Design a protein with these regions (language model features):
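Short helix-loop-beta junction
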Residues: 114-129
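Short gly/ser/thr-rich secondary-structure transition/capping motifs
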Residues: 130-136
Length: 203
């Protein structure tokens, strides 16, 4: 709406989270929405980074006073921050830090993940997030994969393939075409190391 400098943005600039009372950012404590915006982008919009960049370029010459997204608050005060978050995420620019996502059947791959985390910490990396993919909501795992620059995936071999929850995660990552990550992988096995081979192919 040109005369009001207002845009109805659909899924763009949205976030997860209920509106507890107010509906505009000036009526709400917005602290809880920033991480939920990253989770929302990662899971709903993440595949479309190039399209988001194209849309942001079109908006760069337009004065915007209000953003009405399909999900989340109406943005009035925090427009610059909201656009900045979407700009960074759609460029696939991760923060310094490492996500270790792993599946484990008997605890051995989990032990490896914990040892890797200890070594990373010993080498000065402070932002380290471990995710056991068997027990965690994948939307939060994707959120952190979009957030941080380093990604390490570990899997035991399961029926000559990846552990199912790990395989699902790799498919979700591939669907979103996540770029600009430093990637490593590890695995555990006895008689067949197929999981490591599959992760090497995924890399």
């Amino acid at each position: 709406v040109n005369e009001d400098k207002l845009i109805f943005s659909g899924d763009a600039f949205g976030c997860f989270g209920t509106l507890d009372g107010g509906i505009t950012d000036s009526q709400l404590n917005t602290d809880k929405y920033w991480s939920e915006m990253v989770r929302y982008y990662s899971n709903i919009v993440g595949k479309y980074g190039p399209a988001v960049q194209t849309a942001l370029k079109k908006l760069s010459d337009i004065e915007i006073k209000t953003i009405c997204s399909t999900h989340g608050p109406i943005w009035e005060k925090e427009i610059t921050r909201v656009i900045g978050i979407y700009d960074r995420l759609s460029r696939y620019e991760g923060e310094l830090g490492v996500v270790i996502a792993y599946g484990s059947m008997y605890g051995h791959t989990e032990q490896m993940a914990e040892e890797i985390a200890r070594e990373l910490a010993a080498n000065g990396i402070k932002e380290i997030v471990l995710h056991n993919v068997s027990h965690e909501d994948p939307s939060y795992i994707l959120q952190n994969i979009f957030r941080y620059r380093g990604l390490i995936i570990g899997s035991p071999t399961y029926s000559n393939r990846l552990f199912p929850a790990v395989e699902t995660l790799t498919e979700m990552i591939a669907t979103r075409d996540i770029k600009n990550r430093t990637f490593a992988y590890f695995g555990s096995f006895t008689w067949a190391g197929a999981a490591v081979k599959h992760l090497a192919a995924f890399a």
